[in-house]
Regions:
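Catalytic metal- and UDP-sugar-binding loop of GT-A-like glycosyltransferases, i.e.
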Residues: 67, 90-92
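Short aromatic/hydrophobic "clamp" motif used to bind/position activated sugar donors
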Residues: 87
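Glycine-rich, basic loop-to-helix element that forms the pyrophosphate-binding segment
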Residues: 21, 66-82
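A conserved acidic beta->alpha catalytic loop
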Residues: 39-50, 91
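Short loop->beta transition adjacent to catalytic acidic/histidine clusters or analogous donor-positioning motifs
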Residues: 2-5, 26-37, 58-62
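Membrane-interface aromatic/basic loop that binds lipid-linked glycans or pyrophosphate carriers
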Residues: 284-333
Length: 333
């Protein structure tokens, strides 16, 4: 049995992306881990590359080829086959720092935590130099201690999962992610909290909020573990005709976890930022097919509908950041 299980869902990733990702995993200082690669119905070329690269870079690994069912089902399948005490997820086009598993092991051996969070940093694809990034991360964040979260800390982290706003969970350009990445989750907890396969968008935030709704022991290491590579052809960076529908699905899933005034304000802050992004990424995009007049009417109609209107209480304004207040005046007033 391995101490860690690294689960990598893959769907038609490029060979170079996977090679960089797999290489960063093979360079881990701590070696007691297994790798489970879930091929979520990739084309034949990608499937062959997965098999070849897994054999090249990994010692203990398992490749599972399935039909395309989405990333949530792929991750759940990985959880099913994992044998490690703790599970961590890595996307097939990202890279991790060599100290990640060693850092986690040293803390988890000392404290019986359900979840241990590390730091993630976003890097644009055109700035990518894998060896340089890993070396900088290792030197810059050489020393770190675990911040064990009390009830107040867990509440702060819960709020952070709505809008990534809490300074306690940031360090330089690094931050605790709302995705499943850059964190170690006890296998028994992951098995009881599988990803919602019905959600096609916003499944990451929903999963994190659900995990934190459990009575858990958690800690945070303010050390860079993970590089999220922002790629131009990523689904998150392409024009989507279903942009509004997908974000409505995501925000609706998050709204279910609003439990008090503070989380309501964090939800409002997140919805305001989505509304801001809606203008350049959808209505003002060169691919938008409608007229500007139609866009104006549709946009202002959205503001009055759920989930965009949720949390839109004038009493919440005082809790927003300066940027949030400006966005509120622009989009909600």
């Amino acid at each position: 049995m391995s101490f860690f299980s690294i689960i990598i869902p893959i769907y038609n990733n490029k060979e170079k992306e996977m090679a960089d990702c797999f290489a960063s995993i093979s360079q881990q200082q701590y070696k007691d881990f297994e790798v489970i690669v879930i091929d979520d119905g990739s084309n034949e070329t990608c499937a062959r590359n997965i098999d070849r690269l897994s054999k090249r870079f990994f010692t203990r690994y398992r490749v599972i080829h399935t039909v395309n069912n989405g990333v949530s089902k792929a991750r759940n399948l990985g959880i099913k086959y994992a044998v490690g005490n703790y599970i961590t997820f890595v996307d097939g086009d990202d890279i991790i720092c060599p100290c990640m598993l060693m850092d986690a092991y040293q803390v988890l051996q000392k404290y019986d935590l359900d979840i241990l969070y590390g730091m993630l940093q976003s890097v644009k694809e055109d700035k990518l130099n894998c060896s340089r990034l890993v070396n900088i991360a290792y030197k810059k964040y050489l020393f770190s201690t675990a911040d064990l979260l009390d009830i107040e800390g867990l509440e702060e982290l819960y709020c952070h999962m709505f809008d990534i706003s809490q300074s306690r969970f940031k360090c330089g350009k690094g931050y605790v992610s709302r995705g499943p990445i850059a964190k170690m989750v006890k296998k028994s907890l992951a098995e009881r909290n599988l990803f919602d396969e019905k959600l096609a968008f916003g499944e990451d935030e929903e999963w994190n909020l659900r995990l934190l709704s459990n009575p858990i022991r958690a800690g945070v290491i303010k050390k860079l573990w993970y590089y999220y590579i922002q790629r131009k052809d990523s689904t998150l960076h392409r024009f989507r005709t279903d942009f509004i529908k997908k974000h409505e699905e995501r925000l609706s899933a998050m709204w279910k976890y609003v439990k008090d005034k503070k989380t309501e304000c964090c939800y409002l802050n997140e919805s305001l930022h989505v509304l801001k992004d809606l203008l350049p990424n959808y209505y003002f995009s060169e691919f938008y097919q409608g007229s500007m007049k139609g866009a104006f009417i549709e946009y202002h109609s959205l503001l009055k509908q759920f989930p965009w209107s949720a949390g839109c209480n004038v009493n919440n304004i005082i809790y927003l950041s300066v940027k949030g207040k400006v966005l509120y005046i622009l989009f909600k007033k």
